[in-house]
Amino acid sequence: MYIRSVTESDLTSLYKLVERAPAGLTSLPRDQKILHEKIMQSVESEQAASGQEWQRILLVLFDPVEQCITGVSGLEREKSTAPHYTVDNKLECLRLDTTAISPVKLGSLLLGDTHRRRGFGGLLSKSRFLYLASLPEELSEYIHAELRGWVNNDDASPFWETLGYSLYGDNFSAIDHFRGSQPDAFAFHHLAAHEVPFSLLNQEVLAKMGQVHPDTKNALRMLEQENFGRTCHVDILDGGPIVRATTAEIATIRNSVICPVTEVSTNDLLSDRWMISNSHSKAFRACLHPAALREGMLHVHSQTLSTLKIQPGERVRAILKQSSKQGNIHD
């Protein structure tokens, strides 16, 4: 199992993965045409000549035995108009805000059920930061993530059903799909500059506002461990929290090492597992393999070299795997 950038031939496999995802994964709607557009954006961004041309990257967890995608994570450039609510506790209201939290955001983190609790959730999430560090120029000083808010067992959002439905007349599933497929049209046609007093919201909505769905708690914990902090903003649809970090202070980037690799025999037992990525932003790969850092060199087996498509002596970025729980989904 390893991480690589998405390719056009991954469309069918990616669609099958997304089809099984719960409601609320706005950035990857169950629509093959839209998924194809996002894949092609990623392919084009991977080969972009400059950071200004970069729009999106989708990284997939690939199973070479089954020849299928078992997870996906992503980064994307935020639109200049990015609607969300700002929670104003002093005035006890929600204010619609369209100023981007940061120029780049995390998104599209989804791991199939069969590969949870095997360390792949951490690899899938952290690979985005390893990819960021591989780029020749920093995309943004800051980066943020919008986490999935509370959605009940019927895939309905109490936040939206209480607030949005009364204002705009669409149920959560329909409006969530519309935002994912036509974000600009969504902002223009479905949002008005209303201030929403807390008094219009019931106690359940107020209690859940800014809280993550149970399936997303581990993802939030992981981001907090990466030095992401909560903001005063929440998602426009489900009221989920929005967190932000300084790119250079992200723990995976700050604590990783850059060093050359050397091949050792399989008889050399390497007891620690490392998250390792190559330094090729235009042919990015990452894996979770046994390795040992000795005298400034990362000792690996031949399988690791083959997986990363590198030669002995090439430089890699690596970080020792921690034993913390990892999240499985956020948007």
Language-model regions, residue ranges each:
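Short beta-strand-centered segments at strand-helix junctions
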Residues: H289-E314
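Extended, composition-driven regions rather than compact fold-specific motifs
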Residues: R56, I69, L75-S80, E138-E295, ...
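A short beta-loop-alpha structural element at the N-terminal edge
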Residues: Y2-L14
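Conserved acyl-donor/pantetheine-binding loop and adjacent beta-alpha core of acyl/acetyltransferases
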Residues: G74-S108, S173-D184
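Active-site rim helix/loop that mediates acceptor-substrate recognition in acyltransferases
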Residues: S27-T70, G74-A82
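Conserved acetyl-CoA-binding loop-helix of GNAT-fold acetyltransferases
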Residues: S108-L111, R116-L132
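Short, charged beta-turn/beta-strand-edge "cap" motif at the junction between a beta-strand
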Residues: L320-Q326
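A generic structural signal for residues embedded in beta-strands
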Residues: V316-A318
